[in-house]
Amino acid sequence: MTPAGDTPERGSGDRAVAEAAERAKATGARNIPVFDDLPLPADTANLRDGVSLSDSLLALLPLVGVWRGEGEGRDADGDYRFGQQIVVSHDGGDYLNWEARSWRLDESGEYHSPALRETGYWRFVTDPADPHETQAIELLLAHSSGYIELFYGRPLNQSSWELVTDALARSKSGTLVGGAKRLYGIVEGGDLGYVEERVDADGGLVPHLSARLSRYVG
């Protein structure tokens, strides 16, 4: 028997669908700017517009779009809040383009200074830990702070994905960092939420970043 407190509110599913349709009236009409004079398919962050998504990426389909919002970070100086935009686009190839930009916020929630920035690609590859059985997510990132990071992971379900650092390469000017674990998921209201933990000087995973971003495009 279902406890009274767990009973879904009557009509809640219909309202969720209606709210999603209302959001799509704005987000579904937008896309990222592109040059239209190139001879190859343009990047698109809107599944309604442009070239079709590769079948090999269907398990990552919910990520496609432009996402904006705020989050919380922690570094050697303490906790801080940041704003962020993530662009997830494709050109019909077997990978997703990824670009994330963030900026620190002051105590009043206004822009303070540039923060982390990363760009890279998501794709599915033969799982290096289980080459005969499964496909793994591969995420290759270049960070503006001077290092390249390779993640492998897997979908947890149709709308969440977990990744762990497999390798790091740092430039001479790059920030010294440890590996990370990331969890992304589509949460209530269709937002994109994520948490990142990084290995600290003591060798353990500690909270580093978390954010909840609303769909702006797609």
UniProtKB/Swiss-Prot annotation:
> Position of motif GXWXGXG?
65-71
Which reactions fall under this protein's catalytic activity?
peroxynitrite = nitrate
What does this protein need as cofactor? heme b
Q: Which Gene3D superfamilies match?
A: 2.40.128.20
- Record keywords, A-Z: Heme, Iron, Isomerase, Metal-binding
The domain of life is Bacteria
Q: Where is the composition biased (Basic and acidic residues)?
A: 7-24
Q: Which residues cross the membrane?
A: none
Q: By its UniProt entry, which InterPro entries does this protein fall under? A: Calycin (IPR012674), Nb(III)_bact/plant (IPR022939), Nitrobindin (IPR045165), THAP4-like_heme-bd (IPR014878)
Binding annotation for heme b: K181, H208
The molecular function GO annotations come to: heme binding; metal ion binding; peroxynitrite isomerase activity
SUBUNIT field: Homodimer.
* Similarity comment: family membership: Belongs to the nitrobindin family.
The UniProt function text for this chain reads: Heme-binding protein able to scavenge peroxynitrite and to protect free L-tyrosine against peroxynitrite-mediated nitration, by acting as a peroxynitrite isomerase that converts peroxynitrite to nitrate. Therefore, this protein likely plays a role in peroxynitrite sensing and in the detoxification of reactive nitrogen and oxygen species (RNS and ROS, respectively). Is able to bind nitric oxide (NO) in vitro, but may act as a sensor of peroxynitrite levels in vivo.
Q: Tell me what this protein is called.
A: Peroxynitrite isomerase 2
Source organism of the structure:
Mycolicibacterium smegmatis (strain ATCC 700084 / mc(2)155)
Lineage runs: Bacteria, Bacillati, Actinomycetota, Actinomycetes, Mycobacteriales
